[in-house]
């Protein structure tokens, strides 16, 4: 009997200035699936002296960490492994000593990449894992360097690596561990001076969306969610968190809801750099990217991943993995878009992400049926909220889960969500339910001709009376749906012509 060939494993290791990271994935069905993530706080940059020589203690911390990584690498083909060093290993005068022993421990070569190459790889990781239309600004605050990239699609248009990071700024501007206004102001001002040479180029290029791809940004998002805020980072929120940090006199006393002990040490320095970036570049809002350097390394190795719309690739891979009827998903999505257009399109739901989320839900709403029909909506919600979905933010995944939970039968009001406004979120759900109901025979040729009109939240669905008379099940389901929506304050009437 033939034995199935397992999917190939790939490993990417990033010897960062603050942490060493290892990512192990497998390539399956045109996408990558994360198999392991290992992270150790090495704080290599903190071991640099005034002559940029690494201390023996810092090097030993790094070697000890790599001994752990080496065990996992034994099972992965050499050609599927990429190991890179970044800012601290670019700077250290005795980097050769560290790398020679590290190579022996790992059994694989370490490539110390330039700042520009690091920025390009970060952008590749973001482009393959984060959605969003138009030009994007990517910010990655590392331990000893900060990368800023402007790009569109898979092409980077501006690449910059600046010699400032959360570890080096900690040692330079918070050396006394005091969280004073003076220390914060000095750290922010110094970061702005580093940014000055690139401001003209970056503001002239411009961008449509801004994403952050670092531990600093991830920590900020975790804090904001823990404190009941949405996931979008703004300057106002950063300033609020700075005030919270300054309530502690000393760094070791820092206690902010949602901030883990592991991230606390470099939080004020990373926050200072991010405030400077927001103020210098007049950034309105930032969200967390789906990937960065390690993901970029993986996507460089996996050659046959198509450079296509990230969300389209995600949907296709999920449909394949969970055996979802993609033709029916396309039918529901097409009908949902048609109903939206009949209601006035963007004039009725004036949010650019709304139709994308509507179509995604339409294509994936049956994912839970692979587990069980009876609680299909519940299973669909759980899967969409917990799967890795490149191209979708955490808030969008949460919202998708809540609307597919309610795609049929019983209807309840949506809980608080941050992907869309309350009004838009509700309207998208109403369209999804109608599209699923009207396409229940699973063939576009058998769909009724309908006209949906909207006066604010009052919907009127008009169908051919003769068709309804011949299709009593659909008629009954539409009457029930009208009652369900109307009962929770969403008026829906069914009319015949």
Swiss-Prot record:
Swiss-Prot/TrEMBL GO biological process terms: guanosine pentaphosphate catabolic process; guanosine tetraphosphate biosynthetic process; nucleobase-containing small molecule interconversion
Entry keywords, A to Z: Hydrolase
Pathway: Purine metabolism; ppGpp biosynthesis; ppGpp from GTP: step 2/2
E.C. no: 3.6.1.40
Catalysed reactions, semicolon-separated: guanosine 3'-diphosphate 5'-triphosphate + H2O = guanosine 3',5'-bis(diphosphate) + phosphate + H(+)
Molecular-function GO term, any one: guanosine-5'-triphosphate,3'-diphosphate diphosphatase activity
Uppermost EC category: hydrolase
Pfam families assigned: Ppx-GppA, Ppx-GppA_III
The keyword NADP belongs to this UniProt entry's keyword annotation: no
Cited function: Catalyzes the conversion of pppGpp to ppGpp. Guanosine pentaphosphate (pppGpp) is a cytoplasmic signaling molecule which together with ppGpp controls the 'stringent response', an adaptive process that allows bacteria to respond to amino acid starvation, resulting in the coordinated regulation of numerous cellular activities.
Family: Belongs to the GppA/Ppx family. GppA subfamily.
Name under which the protein is recorded: Guanosine-5'-triphosphate,3'-diphosphate pyrophosphatase
């Amino acid at each position: 009997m033939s034995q199935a060939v397992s999917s190939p494993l790939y490993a990417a290791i990033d010897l960062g200035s603050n942490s060493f990271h290892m990512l192990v994935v497998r390539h399956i069905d045109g996408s990558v699936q994360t198999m392991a993530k290992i992270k150790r706080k090495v704080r290599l940059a903190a071991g640099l002296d005034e002559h940029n020589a690494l201390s023996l203690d810092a090097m030993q911390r790094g070697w000890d960490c790599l001994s752990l990584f080496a065990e996992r690498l034994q099972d992965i083909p050499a050609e599927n492994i990429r190991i890179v060093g970044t800012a601290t290993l670019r700077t250290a005068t005795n980097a050769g000593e560290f790398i020679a022993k590290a190579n022996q421990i790992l059994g694989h070569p370490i490539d110390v990449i330039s700042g520009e190459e690091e920025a390009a790889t970060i952008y590749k990781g973001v482009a393959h894992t984060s959605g969003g239309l138009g030009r994007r600004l990517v910010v990655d605050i590392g331990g000893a360097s900060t990368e800023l990239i402007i790009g569109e699609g898979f092409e980077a248009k501006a690449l910059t690596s600046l010699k400032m990071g959360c570890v080096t700024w900690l040692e330079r501007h918070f050396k006394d561990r005091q969280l004073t206004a003076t220390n914060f102001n000095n750290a922010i001002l110094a970061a702005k001076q580093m940014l000055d040479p690139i401001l003209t180029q970056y503001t002239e290029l411009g961008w449509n969306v801004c994403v952050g791809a670092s531990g600093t940004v991830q920590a900020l998002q975790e804090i904001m969610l823990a404190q009941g805020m949405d996931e979008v980072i703004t300057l106002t929120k950063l300033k609020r968190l700075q005030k919270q940090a300054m309530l502690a006199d000393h760094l070791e006393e820092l206690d902010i809801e949602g901030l883990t002990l592991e991230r606390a040490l470099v939080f004020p320095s990373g926050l200072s750099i991010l405030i400077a970036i927001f103020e210098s570049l007049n950034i309105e809002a930032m969200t967390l990217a789906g990937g960065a350097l390690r993901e970029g390394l993986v996507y460089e190795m996996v050659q046959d991943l198509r450079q296509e719309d990230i969300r389209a690739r995600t949907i296709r891979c999920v449909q394949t993995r969970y055996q979802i009827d993609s033709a029916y998903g396309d039918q529901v999505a097409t009908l949902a878009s048609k109903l939206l257009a009949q209601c006035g399109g963007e004039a009725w739901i004036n949010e650019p992400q709304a139709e994308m989320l509507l179509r995604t839900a339409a294509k994936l709403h049956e994912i839970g049926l692979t587990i069980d029909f009876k609680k299909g909506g519940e299973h669909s919600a759980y899967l969409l909220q917990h799967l890795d979905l490149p191209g979708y933010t955490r808030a969008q995944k949460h919202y998708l889960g809540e609307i597919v939970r309610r795609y049929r039968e019983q209807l309840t009001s949506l809980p608080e969500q941050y992907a869309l406004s309350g009004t838009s979120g509700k309207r998208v759900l109403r369209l999804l339910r109608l599209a699923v109901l009207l396409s229940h025979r699973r063939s576009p040729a058998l769909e009724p001709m309908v006209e949906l009109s909207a006066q604010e939240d009052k919907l009127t669905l008009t169908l051919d009376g003769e068709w309804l008379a011949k299709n009593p099940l659909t008629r009954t389901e539409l009457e029930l749906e009208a009652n369900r929506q109307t009962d929770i304050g969403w008026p829906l009437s069914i009319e015949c012509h």
